[in-house]
Regions:
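Surface-exposed molecular-recognition determinants
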Residues: 1-200
Length: 200
């Protein structure tokens, strides 16, 4: 009694797939000529390094800018029961397993790049990621100290590393608003006030 279930329709025009890269061999990843028709971008990263080590790092660079001091990051993270935070100049969104980490384990991050086409402000990112064999999760915010619209994104693992084969990175565009189809509007208009009162 008193339980409620709500359902929502999310139009396919709200989030649009731009490009997917799945590596067949070790490499770094670049997205070029990014469309300037969205409000925000989302990177979905499923990655592992090809160099020995339990933990490796990679950077996310915009418009070919690889100057470390042009990026800032604030991170809150938890490893097992230990919680900590730090801030420093870095384009690194998180950690991924190295080649000697547990076999078949990949790290995962979701990176939101907000207002990437606006040219009157620095670019901000929100990052959530981690991987289970290290029992670590990270939540970060980042800033690129540049007002230029973002037209390219590079994901580069710390030298001499590259991403291992099987790494998958997807880029999507996000619209702040999405037009409703005429059929959806008609369906909404067909709801009788009495039915709404009954639900309430």
């Amino acid at each position: 009694t008193g339980s409620m279930l709500s359902t929502y329709f999310i139009p396919s025009t709200g989030t649009n797939f731009i490009e997917r890269q799945e590596l067949g061999s070790a490499a770094n990843i670049t997205f070029s000529d990014i469309p300037q028709t969205y409000d925000h971008l989302e990177l979905s990263v499923y990655a592992r390094s090809d160099v020995s080590g339990d933990v490796r790092q990679y950077g996310v660079y915009f418009n070919g800018d690889t100057t470390i001091s042009n990026y800032e990051r604030q991170t809150f993270y938890a490893t097992n029961a230990t919680v900590a935070a730090y801030q420093y100049s870095s384009p690194v969104p998180g950690i991924i397993p190295g080649a000697t980490s547990t076999a078949n384990v990949f790290g995962a991050q979701t990176i939101i790049i907000q207002n990437y086409v606006l040219t009157d402000r620095h670019k901000s990112t929100l990052i959530l990621g981690g991987y289970t064999t290290r029992a670590e999760i990270q939540l970060s915010s980042g800033r690129w100290k540049n007002t230029a619209a973002i037209t390219s994104i590079e994901l580069i693992v710390d030298s001499p590393d590259e991403f291992e084969a099987g790494t998958i990175v997807e880029l999507r565009g996000i619209h702040s608003t999405a037009p409703a189809a005429a059929s959806d509007v008609a369906a909404l208009n067909s709801i009788a006030p009495a039915d709404i009162e009954a639900v309430n």
